[in-house]
Every structure is written in structure tokens, then in C-alpha cells.
From Swiss-Prot:
<protein>
    <recommendedName>
        <fullName>Ubiquitin-like protein ATG12</fullName>
    </recommendedName>
</protein>
<feature type="region of interest" description="Disordered">
    <location>
        <begin position="1"/>
        <end position="29"/>
    </location>
</feature>
<feature type="region of interest" description="Disordered">
    <location>
        <begin position="86"/>
        <end position="105"/>
    </location>
</feature>
<comment type="function">
    <text>Ubiquitin-like protein involved in cytoplasm to vacuole transport (Cvt), autophagy vesicles formation, mitophagy, and nucleophagy. Conjugation with ATG5 through a ubiquitin-like conjugating system involving also ATG7 as an E1-like activating enzyme and ATG10 as an E2-like conjugating enzyme, is essential for its function. The ATG12-ATG5 conjugate acts as an E3-like enzyme which is required for lipidation of ATG8 and ATG8 association to the vesicle membranes. ATG12-ATG5 rearranges the ATG3 catalytic center and enhances its E2 activity.</text>
</comment>
<keyword id="KW-0833">Ubl conjugation pathway</keyword>
<dbReference type="GO" id="GO:0061723">
    <property type="term" value="P:glycophagy"/>
</dbReference>
<keyword id="KW-0472">Membrane</keyword>
<dbReference type="GO" id="GO:0019776">
    <property type="term" value="F:Atg8-family ligase activity"/>
</dbReference>
<dbReference type="GO" id="GO:0034727">
    <property type="term" value="P:piecemeal microautophagy of the nucleus"/>
</dbReference>
<comment type="subunit">
    <text>Forms a conjugate with ATG5. Forms a thioester bond with the 'Cys-116' of ATG10. Interacts with the ATG7 C-terminal 40 amino acids domain. The ATG12-ATG5 conjugate forms a complex with several units of ATG16. The ATG12-ATG5 conjugate also associates with ATG3.</text>
</comment>
<dbReference type="GO" id="GO:0000421">
    <property type="term" value="C:autophagosome membrane"/>
</dbReference>
<comment type="similarity">
    <text>Belongs to the ATG12 family.</text>
</comment>
<dbReference type="GO" id="GO:0000422">
    <property type="term" value="P:autophagy of mitochondrion"/>
</dbReference>
<dbReference type="GO" id="GO:0015031">
    <property type="term" value="P:protein transport"/>
</dbReference>
<dbReference type="GO" id="GO:0034045">
    <property type="term" value="C:phagophore assembly site membrane"/>
</dbReference>
<dbReference type="InterPro" id="IPR007242">
    <property type="entry name" value="Atg12"/>
</dbReference>
<dbReference type="InterPro" id="IPR029071">
    <property type="entry name" value="Ubiquitin-like_domsf"/>
</dbReference>
Amino acid sequence: MNSGVLLSESETDTSETSERQSGLLSAQGSIKGKLEEFSAKLDRLRLDDENSEEEHALKSQSVSVNSEGNISRSASASASASASASAKLRNSQSPVQEYTSDTNPETDASFRVKIRLRPIGSIPQIQPRVCQISSHQNFSALVKFLCKRLKRNHVHCYINNAFAPSLNQTIGDLWSQFKTNDELIVSYCETVAFG
């Protein structure tokens, strides 16, 4: 009777051992699958070839799963892999950080745009020829300024002698699209100059 109990305990021990081994095998398969998936993701994320030595070290290192289900890597290989991953992360983030940290004068509310005023025809020249206006103001503010300065009821204005912008368009948008030597060239006249 005693041997029967011992036999059943040994049977449970072997069944537990076989369950552990099958669990380890499935864990090894899932770990191996995860490692392959991670490797494929890293291959897709390769952004530049500057770190080719680090990438070569990452490819040449061997990752093994031992019988206990633990992942073993040499310490230097894991350090080089983490250094490579952090370098890639820094390289991929740096253009975004530089772009967002740069101040864009066109979006700055206090940015002032230089405007060069050129007369067309017999209309008098305004002195000084270059003035500054806030970039968030509409083009109508410039037209009103010219009307007051020239003492006229109406003035026709053109950008780069090419087109008449709408009065509600912002000066900053016009400057960013049509600037010449960081100045917006505005031609003005009494009558319609360009049909």
C-alpha cells in the first residue's frame, strides 16, 4: 500500500515535470517568435546607415534560449544593442525636436514684416519707401494706410507687380509666399494698372 502511494506520487511528479517541460517548450517557441517579431520590427525601423557598426554588432550577436527558458546574451552584446536602439531613437527624434524648437517668425504674433512701397504711374512716392507692419494684420490695413498717406479715397495695390490680393488676406501669409529679400514688394497706383 505504501508503494502504491509512492508510485502515484512519482507519477504525479513525472506528469508535473512533463507539464513543465511542455510549458517551457511552448514558452521557448513564444519567446523565439517574439524575438523574431522584434527583430523584424527593428529591421523596418532602420532609419539611417550611420550606425552600421552598431547594427552589425546587433546582427552578429547570438540570442539563445537555454533549457530553463531563460534568454541568455553576453553583457557587451546587450549593452551594444541598447546603445544602438537609443542612438536610433535619438536620431529619429532629433529632426522633430529641432523643428518644433525653432521659432517660426511667420507664426509669431509680434513679428513685423518689411514692406517696400513702389508707385506705378503718376501717383507720388511715399517717404520712407520701406515700412513695417505686424504680420497678423490684414492687407486692408496697408491699403488704409496708403489712402491716408496719399490723401486719396481709393488706391489699387499689387504684390510684385503681378496680382491684387484680397483685402482680408493677412500680411504674414503674403510675406511668407511672395517675399523678395525678406521684403514684401507692394506696388500702388490710382487706377487699375493690370487688367
